[in-house]
Each structure stands twice: as C-alpha cells, then as structure tokens.
Amino acid sequence: MERATDEAQETGSATVEAEHVLLAIAAEPENTTRELLDSAGLDRQRIRDALDEEFKRSLGAAGVVVEGRELPGPRRSVKRPSRMGASVRLILERGVAAADNKRNLRPAHLLLGVLRLNVGTVPRALALTGADLDELTARVRRSLPDEAEKR
C-alpha cells in the first residue's frame, strides 16, 4: 500500500484509488505478480496507457472533446494522500478474505481484489487492453498458497 500511496501522490490525487494500487502492483519487484501481469500482456506502461485512454473516454462521455489534444500531465502533490477511496477498501477487503488474515496478505491477493472490481475506472481501463481477465484471475488464484482464495 506504500507504493500505491506514492502513485497517488505522483498523480496529485487526494485519495488512494484502485488505479494506484494496480500501478503499484505492476511496479512491484515481487516476481509472482509481475509475471502474472506480464503473462496477460499487462506491464506498468500498458496499464498506464489504458488508464489514460479510459480517462479520455470518460471525458468524451461528459462532452469534453480531447481528440488530437495532449492532456496535461498530472501534478505531483506535496502532501501524501491519507485516505483510501472506496475501491481500495474493496480491494483490501477482498484481498484479506483471500489471504484468510492480514498477516498472510501478499501482492497477489491485492491483484485478485483489483481483478474482482466490477465497476469503476480500473475495470473499464483493463477492458480496453483486450487482456483475458478471466484467465488472469484464474492464474492469480492458482498462484495463491494452498488456494487460500475459495470465497
């Protein structure tokens, strides 16, 4: 979660959201989650690009035309976000449930929580990548020790 907070601060967000968790997982030096994401063609840059495209499409749905224009980059916040958004609370809840307790929580559990989100920025962005998210979810579940995720 420390890396997710860093991601949120880099984008100037007042809260840590699901996209920050996903970007943090993609940048995680821990091999399991990185290999799982790579197996689906989802490296950190591809995820970032999908999030940017989702943002442009959301603006378009609100009537803001950005075709042919480059969006300004995010401004880093001087203050670290101290709050978690609802999407992160869901990720943590699902991750802890998959791990059976907080002490066993690993990045793969959080990735499973991210992949189980049904609505919001991250599911829309991941859909834009064309990655087989059902297969990725199955691979994540298989990677968990003793198949702890049974709920």
Question: Residues of each region from the PLM?
Answer:
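Histone-fold recognition with a strong bias for associated Lys/Arg-rich disordered tails
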Residues: 1-151
